[in-house]
Amino acid sequence: MQPEQLAGCAVVLTVTVLTLRWMFRVDKGGEVSESRTSSSGVDNEPPVNSEHVHLVKTVFPHLESSAIAYDLQKTKNVDATIENALRGQPLPLPPRNSSLYARFPLSAGAGASSHSEETTPSHEVTSNVSSGSSASSLASNEHRSLIETYNLSSRISSSDNSSSSTGNEEVRNRSKLPSSKKEREELFRKRKEEMILAARKRMEGKIKGEKQDKN
């Protein structure tokens, strides 16, 4: 065989080997990615903003962060998640294989029993009809203590609430968080105060409605 033919065969063989290796690598990578997605389902989970979880947690400190994150995945809205929490029912925990537990671990008191039984904290009563008023009363006391903690008593008047709502809309209309740490902390503080006041107003309306139903 002539040198030219040998060189041509070597080039063809090299190209063939490289092509086969590339095809094998692509197929293998696709299989790994597909199996990872199908086995865990983690890649299909909607993203959750940890800052939103923190905001809800400040209003309802007894709720599990993973349960808050799981509800935010479904509602995609902080106010909607707060409404769900105000109903007096415990927010459900995510599935066992959820990636949310890596970011928001269960508290030490929750344990594995929270998964199987989805138990309610001792201060939440949700088992019968009378539990609605009990849960509302407890939540109202909790909001009252939060208002005292953050010195928000002076902002409970109707005029202050209206101005607070206006400020709340201005804050939420910001599409991006401030760049400096100080501005972010101030923004979170305002959001926290506005959420506590809004939650208190909703809870007062709920308690008033329950009293009217009893009468």
UniProtKB/Swiss-Prot annotation:
Residues 48-90 form the CUE domain. GO terms for molecular function: ubiquitin binding; ubiquitin-protein transferase activator activity. The keyword Heme does not apply. Residues 109-191 are annotated as: Disordered. GO terms for biological process: ERAD pathway. It is found in: Mitochondrion. Residues 122-140, 153-165 have a biased composition (Low complexity). The keyword Transit peptide applies. One of its GO terms (cellular component) is Hrd1p ubiquitin ligase complex. InterPro entries: CUE. Residues 1-29 form a transit peptide. Residues 180-191 have a biased composition (Basic and acidic residues). Its main location: mitochondrion. Coiled coil: none annotated. It holds the Pfam family CUE. This is CUE domain-containing protein 4, mitochondrial.
